UniProtKB/Swiss-Prot annotation:
Family from the record: Belongs to the TRAFAC class translation factor GTPase superfamily. Classic translation factor GTPase family. PrfC subfamily.
Domain of life: Bacteria
Organism: Syntrophotalea carbinolica (strain DSM 2380 / NBRC 103641 / GraBd1) (Pelobacter carbinolicus)
Biological role: Increases the formation of ribosomal termination complexes and stimulates activities of RF-1 and RF-2. It binds guanine nucleotides and has strong preference for UGA stop codons. It may interact directly with the ribosome. The stimulation of RF-1 and RF-2 is significantly reduced by GTP and GDP, but not by GMP.
Cellular compartments per GO CC: cytosol
Entry keywords, A to Z: Cytoplasm, GTP-binding, Nucleotide-binding, Protein biosynthesis
Location in or out of the cell: Cytoplasm
Protein name per UniProt: Peptide chain release factor 3
Span of domain tr-type G: 10-278
GO biological process, one term: regulation of translational termination
Molecular-function annotations in GO: GTP binding; GTPase activity; translation release factor activity, codon nonspecific; translation release factor activity, codon specific
Residues that coordinate or bind GTP: 19-26, 87-91, 141-144
InterPro entries in the cross-refs: EF-G-like_DII (IPR053905), EFG_III/V (IPR035647), G_TR_CS (IPR031157), P-loop_NTPase (IPR027417), PrfC (IPR004548), RF3_C (IPR032090), RF3_dom_3_sf (IPR038467), RF3_GTP-bd (IPR041732)
C-alpha cells in the first residue's frame, strides 16, 4: 500500500449527527459547514419560510415543515482533514433511514437540547450506535436559553444512556447570562458575540484563569467559573481517547449553535480525536481501509435529488482501495461489470464530479433501477458487506388513485420510493392492491407529497387491518406451499420479492407462529 493512500485514509473523518427533533441538529450542521468554509453564510433555519432554507434540508416537504426527513451527505475540508458529514433525519418516524446512515459512518455527534436533556429519539439512536460500538461525541446545545444545570445534564446522559461523560468545555452562565465557554481541552476561554451568521474572523482567547481581564469581562461570573473549573478538574472524568474510541466514554462540549458558541472548539477536538475509517464486516472477512483492492457498499438510494433530471442516486461508502473516475467494478448481486463514469460528491444539493475518492468517502452513483440498498461493488473479490437491515413496519396504508389513468406513474413512483427505503411496498397474493408499510406514520405524508410533486400522481390512503409484518422462510417446500394456501389472505411480496406475512395484531401473529413451527418469521431482514 502506498504512503499516499495511507495518508488519504488517515485524514478522513466520516460521521453522522444524531439527535431528538428540534435539538438544533440542522443548525449545528450549517455551522460546521460554515467553519469548514463550505458555505459563507449559515442558512438561518429560523428564516425557513423565507427564500433561503438551511443548506441540508433540500426536499420541498422539508422546506415547508422545517424537519429533516432524508439524510444528506456533505463533504468539506477543515485543517487539512477531509470531512464527510451525514445529516440524519430529525423526525422520530425516520429511524430506519437513520439506522442505515449509521452503518456508513465511523463515529457520531450527538446533539442534546440543554433545556430537555436526553429525549426518546436520542435514546433509540444511541442503542443503534451501541450495536456497532460507534464512538460518540456530544454537543449540548441552546445554552443561550435557560436550561438544566450543566452537572445535571452530564448526570442525565450517564444514567440514561449508560455512557461515561468527559466534559471538554464548560459554559459560563446560561440564557441571558451566557458569556461563552471555557475550553478544558485547550485550557482557553472563548468569548463570542451573539447572532453571527458569517464565520467570525477571530475570537478572544484568554489562556490563564487568573488573568485580570477575566474579571473585567465576566464580572461576578469570573469567580464562579474559577470554582467550576477547579471542581471539574478534581471530580469530572478525565478524557481518555481509547475509551472514547471503544464507545465507552463521550467527550462533551457545551454551546449555542445558532450563535456559533462552542462549535469550532468541538470541531477542532473532533478532527483530532475521532476515528479514521474503520474496518468493515463482510460475510467472509473484515475489510481494512488500508487494503489496495477497491470495495464498498450502497447504504441509501435517493430519487429525484434534482427534479429537472428525474434521477436516482445510490449513496456509496468506500471501504477500501481508491476510486478513480471511469473505473470498472463488479456489481456482485447482479454479477455484472460496470463502469462508473460520473460519480458525484455532495454538498447538500450541490454536486461535483469526483475524479478520485478514498476509504471513508461517500460518493453518489447514478442509478437507473439496477442498484439496491445493501449492494456491494469491488474490483476483484466477491464480497457481501453486512449489517444493513430493513425493520418490520408497524403502520400500514392502502394506496388508491384518484385518476385510474395514472396507474403506471403510481407504480413507478411507489417502486422508486420503496427502493430508497423511505417506505416498504407490499403486493398481496390475492389482489392487486398496493400496501405501504412504514416504521412511522409521517412517512406516509412524505410519500403522498412526493408522489404529487415528483410523479404528478394524486392518490389517497385507506386504512387496512394490519398491525405488523414478518418476512417468512421455510426449508420444507411442501410446508411452505401449505402455509401459502392456508394463509393467503395475509401474505404479500415486498418490493424485492420476499414473502411477507401481514398480521392484523400481535396476538394473531403469535397464534400463526404457534400453528406453523417450521416456518421462520423474521422481524428484520438484511438487504439482499
Amino acid at each position: 500500500m502506498s504512503k499516499n493512500h495511507r495518508k488519504e485514509v488517515d485524514r478522513r473523518r466520516t460521521f453522522g449527527i444524531i439527535s431528538h427533533p428540534d435539538a438544533g441538529k440542522t443548525t449545528l450542521t450549517e455551522k460546521l459547514l460554515l467553519f469548514g468554509g463550505a458555505i459563507q453564510m449559515a442558512g438561518a433555519v429560523k428564516a425557513r419560510k423565507a427564500a433561503r432554507h438551511a443548506t441540508s434540508d433540500w426536499m420541498a416537504m422539508e422546506q415547508e415543515r422545517g424537519i429533516s426527513v432524508t439524510s444528506s451527505v456533505m463533504k468539506f475540508n477543515y485543517r487539512d482533514y477531509e470531512i464527510n458529514l451525514l445529516d440524519t433525519p430529525g423526525h422520530q418516524d425516520f429511524s430506519e433511514d437513520t439506522y442505515r446512515v449509521l452503518t456508513a459512518v465511523d463515529s457520531a455527534l450527538m446533539v442534546i437540547d440543554s433545556a430537555k436533556g436526553v429525549e426518546t429519539q436520542t435514546r433509540k439512536l444511541m442503542e443503534v450506535c451501541r450495536m456497532r460500538n460507534t464512538p460518540i461525541m456530544t454537543f449540548i446545545n441552546k445554552l443561550d436559553r435557560e436550561g438544566l444545570e450543566p452537572l445535571d445534564l452530564l448526570a442525565d446522559i450517564e444514567e440514561t444512556l449508560q455512557i461515561e461523560c468527559a466534559p471538554l468545555s464548560w459554559p459560563i452562565g446560561m440564557g441571558k447570562r451566557f458569556k461563552g465557554t471555557y475550553n478544558l481541552y485547550r485550557k482557553q476561554l472563548c468569548l463570542f458575540m451573539a447572532g453571527q451568521e458569517t464565520r467570525p474572523q477571530d475570537m478572544l482567547v484568554i489562556e490563564d484563569l487568573d488573568d485580570p481581564r477575566l474579571d473585567e469581562l465576566l464580572g461576578s461570573q469570573a469567580d464562579q467559573l474559577r470554582e467550576d473549573i477547579e471542581l471539574l478538574e478534581g471530580a469530572a472524568n478525565p478524557f481518555e481517547p481509547e475509551e472514547y474510541l471503544k464507545g465507552n466514554q463521550t467527550p462533551v462540549f457545551f454551546g449555542s449553535a445558532i450563535n456559533n458558541f462552542g462549535v469550532q472548539e468541538m470541531l477542532d477536538a473532533f478532527v483530532e480525536q475521532a476515528p479514521v475509517p474503520r474496518p468493515a464486516p463482510t460475510t467472509t472477512r473484515e475489510i481494512s481501509p488500508y487494503e489496495e483492492d477497491f470495495s464498498g457498499f450502497v447504504f441509501k438510494i435517493q430519487a429525484n435529488m434534482d427534479p429537472a433530471h428525474r434521477d436516482r442516486i445510490a449513496f456509496f461508502r468506500i471501504c477500501s482501495g481508491t476510486f478513480h473516475r471511469g473505473m470498472k467494478v463488479r456489481h456482485h448481486r447482479i454479477g455484472k461489470d460496470v463502469n462508473i463514469a460520473n460519480a458525484t460528491i455532495f454538498m447538500a444539493q450541490d454536486r461535483a464530479n469526483v475524479e478520485e475518492a478514498f476509504p471513508g468517502d461517500i460518493i453518489g452513483i447514478h442509478n437507473h433501477g439496477t442498484i439496491k440498498i445493501g449492494d456491494t461493488f469491488t474490483d476483484k473479490e466477491p464480497l457481501k458487506f453486512t449489517g444493513i437491515p430493513s425493520f418490520a413496519p408497524e403502520h400500514f396504508r392502502r394506496v388508491r388513485l384518484k385518476n385510474p389513468l395514472k396507474s403506471k406513474q403510481l407504480e413507478k413512483g411507489l417502486i422508486q420510493l420503496a427502493e430508497e427505503g423511505a417506505v416498504q411496498l407490499f403486493r398481496p397474493l390475492f389482489n392487486t392492491d398496493y400496501i405501504l408499510g412504514a416504521v412511522g406514520v409521517l412517512q406516509f405524508d412524505v410519500i403522498m407529497s412526493r408522489l404529487k410533486n415528483e410523479y404528478s400522481v394524486d392518490a389517497i390512503y385507506e386504512g387496512v387491518e394490519y398491525a405488523t409484518a414478518r418476512w417468512v422462510e421455510c426449508d420444507d417446500r411442501k410446508v411452505l406451499e401449505e402455509f401459502e394456501k392456508k394463509c393467503q389472505v395475509n401474505l404479500a411480496y415486498d418490493a424485492e420479492g420476499n414473502l411477507t406475512y401481514l398480521a392484523s395484531s400481535e396476538w394473531r401473529l403469535g397464534h400463526t407462529m404457534e400453528q406453523w413451527p417450521q416456518v421462520v418469521f423474521h422481524k428484520t431482514r438484511e438487504h439482499n
